Amino acid sequence: MTGCASRVESCPAANQTQPGAAYETLAEATYPEMAKYPDETAYMKKDGSFDDEGFSKVYDAWWADKRARRDIDIDRENVQSFVRASTGAMLGEECGKNFVYSPLNVYMALSMLAECTDGDSRAQILSLLRENRLEDVRAQAKALWNANYCADGAVTSVLASSVWLDDGVDYVRKTLDTLAQDYYASSFSGEMGSDSYNKALQSWLNEQTGGLLKDQASGLAFTPETVMALATTIYY
């Protein structure tokens, strides 16, 4: 899980990754289009007056989009319960270290993991997420993603997620489609531990964080024994 902050106003797109022959994109997330915040300077007329009508039309569209995301229904009590329970567990083991923990990233990753598991494993994850049904986890994760998403040209806030599978593992297409549609997560397949697959992971991380964490990303790699890996980032 990776996060970074920047004044960069462009949003790293999920479909920027260009897969090479060494690995395959199984499913690709598409981020929603968002109304752009109007540039006031673009509405200044040659005579020095301001095009209030034109500006207001664009601004109203932006505000309607912004308000709709603000009003997304989220089970806040559920999220707060997860944050309280997980923060102590995550940070308690890192006492004395310069450690950053994003409950939102972990919530998204665990929600995705619940989609990829079954039986007792899924039940344990659902319990940790304070939910009884996978459908509720799915709805909550999608709501959280959209409530925190912004790419209006003035503010950038993007949660990116991905699933990395070993090319010798069978997968369920429906699950990957669900991850792409409801979690905005892309899925890839390749040879675990290979240089090309490791570089693909690093490239994806750099794209999703605007290249601000290249040093950290360069040290991340899969082991040959890895069957599946989840990667999440937050860019704001």
For the regions a protein language model found, what residue spans apply to each?
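Active-site-surrounding "flap" and adjacent substrate/cofactor-binding loops of secreted or lumenal enzymes
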Residues: 115-147
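C-terminal motif of bacterial Sec signal peptides marking the signal peptidase cleavage site
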Residues: 2-3
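Non-catalytic, conformational "gating/processing" segments within enzyme and secreted inhibitor domains
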Residues: 39, 96, 103-106, 134-236
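Generic structural signal for hydrophobic core residues of well-folded globular domains
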Residues: 90, 112-117, 129, 148, ...
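Flexible propeptides and autoinhibitory/regulatory segments associated with cysteine proteases
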Residues: 8-125
